[in-house]
Amino acid sequence: MAASAASGPSAQLAVRVIPCLDVAAGRVVKGVNFLDLQDAGDPVELARLYYEQGADELTFLDVTATVEDRSTMYDVVSATAEQVFIPLTVGGGVRSADDVARLLASGADKIGVNSAAIARPDLVGEIADRFGAQVCVLSLDITRGDTESGFVVTTHGGRTRTTIDAVAWAREAVERGAGELLVNSIDADGTRDGFDLELVAAMRAASRVPVIASGGAGELDHFAPAIEAGADAVLAASVFHSRRFTIGDVKGALADAGQVVRR
């Protein structure tokens, strides 16, 4: 089954479907625009469920601010890695190459960096040089704004707006060594109104590395357009946690739209 001709540069590869688990104090939480967080379950149990459903990868985002709960995240990653045998990406609160080393030792395969990399861009190169570009995922929380590209970077889980052009920052980070872009639309996050396709296309045009589309998935027919806009993978949270769809449902919809998926 051929992939859509409008897909990104990795179109000959299978599209990845990635559940995202936001973790606070050892529990998965969900909300809209990072607000009004509600408990959604045990992270290890959910990770195992999604693995059994056929997820291609898993992403954990540590949304906890305290040092005490940070240690809990290492335990979550370690326990998950013992039961789930697909790539694990972990982000949130990563501020140094030593943080990366500890997460990798706990069982993570890739590490997402966001606010800390904006504050100190050299962090991207430090991670890539020490562990390889494939480990360094630049996570971007993006909103519409008055910049050349029309997209602005936010920090601290979308709560702080910057004046940084999102496309320019993504391009710079890739030059510094980022091996993948996790592109999350703050405007669409949790709304279930669909991915921001203009944002996905802008990131695809600016980058040679894989692009993961995030934010806005709500219907099965939302996923294929994100791939057609240039994404290599699609990430979602609330539609999986609420049992609205399974991973298999999403892969079926992608296959029906002509995309290659792993079964």
From Swiss-Prot:
Pfam families: His_biosynth. Coiled coil: none annotated. Gene3D superfamilies: Aldolase class I (3.20.20.70). InterPro entries: Aldolase_TIM, His_biosynth, HisF, IGPS_HisA/HisF, RibuloseP-bd_barrel. It is found in: Cytoplasm. One of its GO terms (cellular component) is cytoplasm. One of its GO terms (biological process) is L-histidine biosynthetic process. It catalyses: 5-[(5-phospho-1-deoxy-D-ribulos-1-ylimino)methylamino]-1-(5-phospho-beta-D-ribosyl)imidazole-4-carboxamide + L-glutamine = D-erythro-1-(imidazol-4-yl)glycerol 3-phosphate + 5-amino-1-(5-phospho-beta-D-ribosyl)imidazole-4-carboxamide + L-glutamate + H(+). Its EC number is 4.3.2.10. It is an enzyme of class 4 (lyase). Its main location: cytoplasm. One of its GO terms (molecular function) is lyase activity. Pathway: Amino-acid biosynthesis; L-histidine biosynthesis; L-histidine from 5-phospho-alpha-D-ribose 1-diphosphate: step 5/9. The keyword Cytoplasm applies. It comes from the Bacteria. The keyword Amino-acid biosynthesis applies. Keywords: Amino-acid biosynthesis, Cytoplasm, Histidine biosynthesis, Lyase. The active site is at D22, D141. IGPS catalyzes the conversion of PRFAR and glutamine to IGP, AICAR and glutamate. The HisF subunit catalyzes the cyclization activity that produces IGP and AICAR from PRFAR using the ammonia provided by the HisH subunit. PANTHER family: IMIDAZOLE GLYCEROL PHOSPHATE SYNTHASE HISHF, IMIDAZOLE GLYCEROL PHOSPHATE SYNTHASE SUBUNIT HISF/H IGP SYNTHASE SUBUNIT HISF/H. Heterodimer of HisH and HisF. Belongs to the HisA/HisF family. This is Imidazole glycerol phosphate synthase subunit HisF. The gene is hisF.
